[in-house]
Design a protein with these regions (language model features):
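C-terminal transmembrane helix and the adjacent membrane-cytosol boundary/short C-terminal tail
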Residues: 161, 170-171, 217-227, 265-296
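Periplasmic/extracellular loop-to-transmembrane helix junction in inner-membrane transport proteins
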Residues: 22-37, 62-109, 252-272
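N-terminal signal-anchor/first transmembrane alpha helix
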Residues: 17-65, 137, 215-216
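Transmembrane alpha-helices
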Residues: 99-115, 150, 154, 204-234, ...
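Generic hydrophobic transmembrane alpha-helix motif, especially the helices
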Residues: 80, 84, 124-125, 130-186, ...
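Glycine-rich helix-loop "coupling/hinge" segments at transmembrane-helix boundaries
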Residues: 153-156, 184, 232-274
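Short helix-to-coil transition segments within interhelical loops
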Residues: 83-88, 125-126, 195-214, 254
Length: 296
C-alpha cells in the first residue's frame, strides 16, 4: 500500500478511536491534578524547589565555599541557617546545592527514561525471548539494592557525578521498562493497533507513533517517583561519605553533618528539610497524576 493511501486510511480510522483532542486532554488532566490537595501541595513544593534552584545566585549572594563566619555558629540573623564546621554559610550551601541535586536527578531520569521506554516498547510488542530476558534482568536488579550497587561502583572507581548518574540510570531503567511493557501488552491487541498493522504500518511506526502515546501517562508517574528516589539515594550516599566532594549538593551537606549531629543540629536539619520538600513535591504530583489517570 502506498504511503498516501496509508495516511488517508489512518485518518479515516482516527475518529473511531474516540481519542480526545490532545490540548483538551492535557488541560483536563492538569485540572484533575490540581483538583486534588496532593496535586496542589506538590505543585507548590515543586515551584518552591525550582525557584530556589534557578535563582540561587540572587537568593544567596554569599559564596557557599567562602569562610564567612564562626565555625559551627547556630542560626542567627547574619546566618539564617547557621554555619558549618569551616564557618561557611549553610543557607548558601542549601540554596546552591538545590541546582546540583536537581540536575543529578534529571540526568538519572533521562537515562532511565530513554533506556526503559525503548526496551519496554520493543519487548512488549515483540515478546518471546526478549520478554524472558527483561524479566530475568529486572529480577536481578530487584535482588540487589540500588544503594548497594551504587556504593560498590563508587568504592571501586571513585566518586563522581558522571559515575553516579550512569550507575543510578542503568539500575533504574528495568522498573520503567516493566511498566512500559505492561502497558504495551494491554494495548497491543487493541483495534487501533490491529488496524495500523492491517494498513501496513511498520513495527517502528506502531511502537513510537501508536503505542508510545498510550504508555506516556504511566511513565510520567514512574518518572516522578524516580526523581524522589534519586534525591534520597544521593543524600544517602553523601551521608555514607560516598558523595562527590567537588560537587555542592544536598547529599554532600548531609554527609558533612555526620560528625556534628550532637553539637550542631542545623547542619543536618536544613539540608534534610530541603530534600524532604523536594521528594514530597515529586511524590505528591506523581500520586495526583496517577489518580487523575484513574490509577493507571
Amino acid at each position: 500500500m502506498r504511503p498516501s493511501t496509508l495516511a488517508s486510511a489512518s485518518a479515516e480510522l482516527a475518529p473511531a478511536h474516540a481519542v480526545p483532542d490532545p490540548p483538551l486532554q492535557r488541560r483536563s488532566t492538569i485540572a484533575a491534578i490540581l483538583a486534588r490537595p496532593s496535586g496542589k501541595a506538590g505543585l507548590v513544593f515543586l515551584l518552591l524547589t525550582l525557584v530556589v534552584a534557578f535563582l540561587a545566585p540572587y537568593l544567596a549572594r554569599t559564596d557557599p565555599f567562602a569562610l564567612s563566619g564562626t565555625p559551627l555558629a547556630p542560626p542567627t540573623l547574619a546566618h539564617l541557617m547557621g554555619t558549618d564546621a569551616l564557618g561557611r554559610d549553610l543557607l548558601s550551601g542549601v540554596v546552591h546545592g538545590a541546582r546540583a541535586s536537581l540536575m543529578i536527578a534529571s540526568a538519572v531520569a533521562a537515562v532511565a527514561l530513554a533506556c526503559g521506554t525503548a526496551i519496554g516498547l520493543v519487548v512488549g510488542y515483540r515478546g518471546g525471548l526478549l520478554d524472558d530476558a527483561l524479566s530475568r534482568t529486572t529480577e536481578l536488579f530487584q535482588a540487589m539494592p540500588r544503594l548497594f550497587l551504587v556504593a560498590v561502583v563508587i568504592a571501586l572507581f571513585g566518586p563522581g557525578v558522571d559515575r553516579l548518574v550512569l550507575t543510578l540510570g542503568l539500575t533504574s531503567w528495568p522498573v520503567l521498562a516493566r511498566v512500559v511493557r505492561s502497558e504495551v501488552l494491554s494495548t497491543r491487541n487493541a483495534e487501533f493497533v490491529l488496524a495500523a498493522e492491517a494498513l501496513g504500518a511498520s513495527p517502528t511506526y506502531i511502537a513510537w507513533r501508536v503505542l508510545l502515546p498510550n504508555v506516556l501517562p504511566s511513565v510520567a508517574v514512574m518518572v516522578g517517583l524516580l526523581f524522589g528516589q534519586v534525591l534520597l539515594t544521593e543524600a544517602s550516599l553523601g551521608f555514607l561519605g560516598l558523595g562527590d566532594p567537588n560537587t555542592l549538593s544536598w547529599g554532600l551537606l548531609v554527609g558533612a553533618s555526620q560528625g556534628f549531629l550532637r553539637v550542631a543540629w542545623w547542619l543536618a536539619v536544613f539540608p534534610g528539610l530541603a530534600i524532604t520538600i523536594a521528594i514530597l513535591a515529586f511524590n505528591l504530583l506523581a500520586d495526583a497524576l496517577s489518580a487523575a489517570l484513574g490509577g493507571r
